[in-house]
Each structure stands twice: as C-alpha cells, then as structure tokens.
Amino acid sequence: MSDRHTVGVVGARGHTGAELVRLINDHPSLELVFAGSRELAGEAVPGQEGLRFEWIDPDGLAKWEADVVVLALPDGAGDPYVGVVGPGTVVVDISFDHRLDDDWVYGLPELFREKLRGASRIANPGCYATAAQIALAPLVDAVDGVPALFGVSGYSGAGTTPGPRNDPDRLADNLIPYKLIDHNHEKEAVRHLGLPLRFIPHVHPAFRGLLVTAHVPLGRPMSVDELRARFDSAYAEEPLVEISAEIPELRDGAGHMGVIVGGFEMSADGRNAVIIAAEDNLLKGAAVQAMQNINLALGVPEFEGLIG
C-alpha cells in the first residue's frame, strides 16, 4: 500500500517486541511485514491476518524488504543484523549496543527531536535512562555536584529468559538491587546529559512500571516554585511528559504512554531538589519511544498511532 510504510520486528517474542507489534497494528501509517521469533515460528502474529512469526537470522533478514527494521534483541546480538540492512532502511535498535556511538542518533525525542528527523540509524534509549534524563534535563545548568538516583522497575525489564530478577518466587514480598556500580543506563544518561550521576536499580515484584527518585544538588538556592516552573517550561509542549503536583508512584507509570514527573521538593536551604519520574518500562521506556522515533525518521507526525 503506497500510503503506508512497512516495518519488520526482529525479536518479536520478548515483552518489548510484543508491545511493538501491538502498537504497529494500531498505527494508521505502518504495516507490519514480518515478525521474527525462533520460539514462536509458525504461530500467528496477534492482530495480523495471514502473518506468522518466522525465525529470521541475519542471512534471512537480507531477503526481506521493509522501510524500517526494529531490532528488539538482547544486548550484543544485533550487529550481525545491522550489517545486512541497507543504508536506505531505518534501523531502530532497542538494545544498549549503539547508545554511546556517535554514528547513531540517540532516540530520546524530548531532548533530541531535530536530530531524529530523517535519521536512518537510531539507538532507542534505555528505560531507566529515559526517566532519569527527563527528570534531570531541566536542571542541567543548575546542578553543582553529583545527582543520586534510586530506580525501581517491574520484573518485565529483566526480559523473558528465566533468571533471579524475573523469578516470581524470589521476587515475592521482595526488592532486589543489582548492578550496584556502572549500570549501562547510568553511562548512557551521563553521556547524553553531560552530567555525572550515580544510579542504583532495583527490581520490584510488579510486572511493569518504573520509578526513578532523583536527589539533585544545586549550585544556588532555588524555591519549589522555581523548580516546578523549570519543568513546566521545559515540557509545556510535550504530550508524553505529564507534570504532576503529586508524588508519582510506580503503579502510576504502569500502562502510561509517557513519563509522569512530580514530587517536587526542596531542602530547607534550597540547594537540594528531589524529583520523581514514573513511566512504563515497556512503553515510554521502550516501545512507545521506538514508535516516536520511527515516526520522526519517516516524516510521519511524531505522535501518530500513540495519541488520539
């Protein structure tokens, strides 16, 4: 169909891949032409008449034609696929692999929208890195010191391969800290914000939802009203960033298409701010953001298929 753009997903079995398929199905300008999964090969793709999952290796991908290829693969698995995709095809990589690379465009539209228009190689941001950057970006010029971030996510962030961080028995009535130093999303946020920061993630027994609490040292005293005004101004035209007068909770982010930012508090001396950001780790933290990036790369209205 000439008025629609074709999209293929490699790694469609995972939680993010499944959300991508659902969003593509509902998008008026996109057509899903293949969905790759070794485990689901031969099964019908939900919401698609006549389309079945296929096992697509890099050689197999070279035989397909699509305007966009989304790689929803584990870290380190995507480059053989990137190597067979021509320069005229948009590649959106969900993994960490290219988030620090200068020759890929970093896909956080609220901060880097103009670079994403017409881009052909897009590194989709990580879920924690998205929330962290949305929470810190309006304060970059005011920070004096190292912000400290506490992150909590539902266990879907650990993927579908069984392990300690998605084991329901271990997670029951529990909170699991992991990767206490040098988490990839910390490196990513540091790189693209241009700020040092410290971040520790934790897994929660909920399936989805993500929360980041940021403690931010400031170079001069600031009132709560000024703090809130910075965020109101920065995100006034951003439909996927909701500024809240309340303290966001993890459950508020679950199922939400964007990021909820709130909890604005200030220490008595006005030099330490607290900001909280909540999102759905599978949506704005992955699939929704990928759809924004696809739209921008193709010249489609950015929020088509997402809002309205």
Please state what every model-predicted region is.
Residues 138-142, 217, 293-300:
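Active-site catalytic microenvironments for nucleophilic, acid-base chemistry
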Residues 251-308:
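C-terminal helical cap and adjacent loop that interface with cofactors, partners, or active-site loops
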Residues 131, 223, 285-286:
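Secondary-structure boundary/capping motif
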Residues 136, 186, 291:
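Generic structural marker for isolated residues within well-ordered, non-membrane alpha-helices
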Residues 6-9, 123, 213-215, 275-278:
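Short glycine-rich or small-residue beta-strand-to-loop segments that form or flank ligand, phosphate
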Residues 15-18, 22, 27-60, 155-276:
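C-terminal substrate-binding/catalytic lobe of Rossmann-fold NAD(P)-dependent oxidoreductases
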Residues 1-178, 265-269, 304:
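N-terminal Rossmann-like NAD(P) cofactor-binding subdomain of oxidoreductases
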